[in-house]
C-alpha cells in the first residue's frame, strides 16, 4: 500500500529528484517488472522482505538498501509474517548519476547489515519535504541540497574502490589518481598531474574519460569538494581556511566553485549538515 508517491518535473540537466515515496507492504504482494527509471534508491525502515535480481534473492530487514536502475529485471515483495515498510527516492541527471556511480551500491545493488541511519534520515526528510513542495517547484534548492547530501553520504559510507588492471595505461591512471589524492591540498593543476606521470594533458584526459568516466579536472574538483564538505560537517574551521586546506589560494574562487558543485553555498551547507548544529 503506497502511503506516498510523488513525481516531479525534470528541469535540470545535472540533477533532479524524479520521485519519492513510502510503501507499507501487504503480505506477499510485491512487484515484478523491468525497471524504466534511471535510478531509484530504496531503504527498508521496518519489517522484512525479499529482493531478487540477476538470479539472486536477498532477504532484507530494517536498514537494508536496494537500488534499481534502468533495464534491471527485478522482483521485490514483503514477507508474510512481518511485511516491510520502505521509503524510496528516484533521481536522474548527468551529474548526480555520475556521483552515484562512485558508490559501491551501483555494482552490488544491495547493502545489507550496515549502519544506514544517516541515509534513512535524509530519505525520510526528502519524502517529508516533498509533501509541501508543488511539482512545478520540484527542483527547489531545499530538495536538491538533500539529494546531493544523500549521494555523498552513500559515497562516504560505501565508496567504490577504483579497480585498476596492471598494464601500462592503467598504471598511468592509477599514479595520476594517487597524485591527486595525495596532493589535492596543494595548489596543483591538471598540468601538474600530467607531469607527475610524464604524459601530455590530452593523453591524461583520454585516460580519465576511458577509465573513470570524468576528466582530470572534474576528478580533482570532486576530491577537493568532498574533503571541503567533510571539513564543513565535522569542524568549525573558517571557510577561508578550508579553501586553502583543499588547494585554493583564492577563497572567493573556492566559494564560487563550491556553490556551483553543490548548488548551495559553503555557509549554507555547514548550517544544514554540520554535526555541531545537530547536538
Curated annotation (Swiss-Prot):
<dbReference type="InterPro" id="IPR018060">
    <property type="entry name" value="HTH_AraC"/>
</dbReference>
<keyword id="KW-0804">Transcription</keyword>
<keyword id="KW-0805">Transcription regulation</keyword>
<dbReference type="InterPro" id="IPR009057">
    <property type="entry name" value="Homeodomain-like_sf"/>
</dbReference>
<dbReference type="Pfam" id="PF12833">
    <property type="entry name" value="HTH_18"/>
</dbReference>
<dbReference type="InterPro" id="IPR037923">
    <property type="entry name" value="HTH-like"/>
</dbReference>
<feature type="DNA-binding region" description="H-T-H motif">
    <location>
        <begin position="239"/>
        <end position="262"/>
    </location>
</feature>
<feature type="domain" description="HTH araC/xylS-type">
    <location>
        <begin position="174"/>
        <end position="272"/>
    </location>
</feature>
<protein>
    <recommendedName>
        <fullName>Lactose operon transcription activator</fullName>
    </recommendedName>
</protein>
<comment type="function">
    <text>Transcriptional regulator of the lacPH genes for lactose utilization.</text>
</comment>
<dbReference type="GO" id="GO:0043565">
    <property type="term" value="F:sequence-specific DNA binding"/>
</dbReference>
<dbReference type="GO" id="GO:0003700">
    <property type="term" value="F:DNA-binding transcription factor activity"/>
</dbReference>
<dbReference type="Pfam" id="PF02311">
    <property type="entry name" value="AraC_binding"/>
</dbReference>
<feature type="DNA-binding region" description="H-T-H motif">
    <location>
        <begin position="191"/>
        <end position="212"/>
    </location>
</feature>
<keyword id="KW-0238">DNA-binding</keyword>
<keyword id="KW-0010">Activator</keyword>
<dbReference type="InterPro" id="IPR003313">
    <property type="entry name" value="AraC-bd"/>
</dbReference>
<dbReference type="InterPro" id="IPR018062">
    <property type="entry name" value="HTH_AraC-typ_CS"/>
</dbReference>
